[in-house]
């Protein structure tokens, strides 16, 4: 018979096992490789209305997650603030497994960006590794949702799969996730579209912004489903498909243009994650030793004085 007066045994805190205790974590030591962001377009195309570059803003945002890392950025086109300049004079100390990690600031496979990175690496001879782009990733859908809400096209809070009829003529009743980069980019945008549809409770479809046949097919599909206020949400930071070009495309297909992703703290977090993924894959992070692990709380485990 169980004694009801007896206290239950105290459960000691469990140690987290495995190498990846935190997806952003790796062992920090003096000489951590630099993080170089490859910004699509030219320096002029990547400038915002306030004159500040998307690369500079993203560098500040990524620095919040990786303050111990040297962060640079360079543009894949033009002759100012180029990627080749950012890859020049990287520290090749013996305590580094490589000089740097290049993170493309694109949300999907982008042939032009990949080719420019290869050219810059060949030109400089930099010992760097290249990560995947920023997408597909679940946080991209959140950023797209935020941009649509800021423009008044959708509700700011999640609808949680409940379809709600738009109350006015400004809210969207269909969304097109615009991809830039060809078939691979459309596939990545399709993943984001599914996640965004789950957030909004609306029909969300991917389309290739650079292919009018793809746009026509998707817009026709939305119209057949009853959509009269479709919105194009570009899954791009901005320089890949300028705003004026998007506005012309939207007018041609009777849709409204949404804002590009731009620099965002969530995108900065994804960039930091991509950086950590490369270092972890190279074995930079080592499993903690028994001495490095914190001792469990409890009188039996107090360190000897």
Model region roles, listed by residue range:
Residues 1-305:
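Active-site-proximal alpha-helix that buttresses catalytic centers in soluble enzyme cores
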């Amino acid at each position: 018979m169980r004694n009801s007066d007896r206290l239950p045994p105290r459960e000691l805190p469990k140690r987290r096992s495995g190498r990846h205790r935190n997806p952003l974590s790796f062992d920090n030591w003096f000489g951590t490789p630099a993080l170089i962001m490859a910004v699509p377009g030219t320096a002029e195309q990547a400038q915002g209305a306030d004159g500040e570059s998307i690369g500079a803003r993203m560098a500040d945002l990524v620095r919040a997650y990786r303050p111990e890392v040297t962060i640079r950025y360079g543009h894949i086109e033009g002759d100012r603030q180029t990627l080749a300049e950012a890859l020049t004079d990287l520290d090749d100390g013996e305590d580094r497994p490589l000089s740097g990690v290049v993170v493309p600031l694109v949300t999907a496979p982008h042939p032009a960006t990949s080719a420019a990175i290869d050219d810059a690496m060949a030109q400089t001879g930099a010992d760097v590794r290249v990560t995947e782009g920023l997408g597909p990733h679940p946080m991209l859908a959140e950023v797209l949702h935020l941009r649509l809400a800021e423009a008044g096209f959708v509700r700011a809070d999640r609808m949680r799969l409940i379809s709600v009829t738009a109350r006015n003529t400004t809210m969207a009743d269909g969304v097109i996730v615009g991809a830039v980069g060809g078939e691979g980019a459309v596939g990545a945008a399709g993943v984001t579209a599914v996640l965004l549809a789950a957030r909004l409770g609306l029909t969300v479809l991917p389309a290739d912004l650079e292919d009018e046949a793809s746009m026509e097919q998707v817009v026709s599909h939305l119209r057949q489903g009853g959509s009269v206020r479709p919105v194009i949400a570009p899954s791009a930071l901005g320089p890949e498909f300028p705003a004026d070009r998007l506005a012309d495309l939207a007018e041609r297909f009777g849709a409204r243009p949404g804002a590009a992703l731009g620099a965002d703290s969530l995108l900065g977090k994804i960039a930091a994650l991509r950086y950590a993924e490369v270092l972890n894959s190279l074995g930079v992070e080592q499993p903690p030793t028994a001495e490095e692990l914190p001792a469990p709380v409890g009188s039996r485990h107090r360190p000897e004085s």
